Amino acid sequence: MATLEQEIKRNIARGDKKVNGFTGAVRSLENLGLEKGDEFTIPERFDVYEQKIGDNAVRYIMVELKNGNAKPFYPSTFTKSRPVYNQDGTPTGQRVFTKGTAAELFRQYGSVQEGMDALRGKTVKVSDIEQVDTLRYGTTSLMKAQIPTIDLV
């Protein structure tokens, strides 16, 4: 892994850009990059970056993990939700969503910016990651989705 400064340089080199805050809809991402046990503090002052994914753009902040490594953190992680499917591709009727005290706090607010503002300076920890069978977007093929539990520390 890389330091915060190295990771920011890498992301900008691949085309990401710094933007003014969070706007638009929350988009769920499959590859969160989070692992069980990751712990980090949402900075009091953070820069927001925008990453193009196909025709869409997603916004994130960079966080430094307790172990010194850096990762992008997408606020959409707090609202991640997926329907659960059986191995034969039929729906179970269940839906799994991000759990935890940090996710609950974020979801109390009406916008991404307000939710992130409420988390400024707070330390969070990925206390669990649940693997669920779901369908790949726009297809009938099964995939494993990772749904985290993110708690305030």
Would you name each region that the model predicts?
Residues 1-153:
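Short beta-rich binding modules
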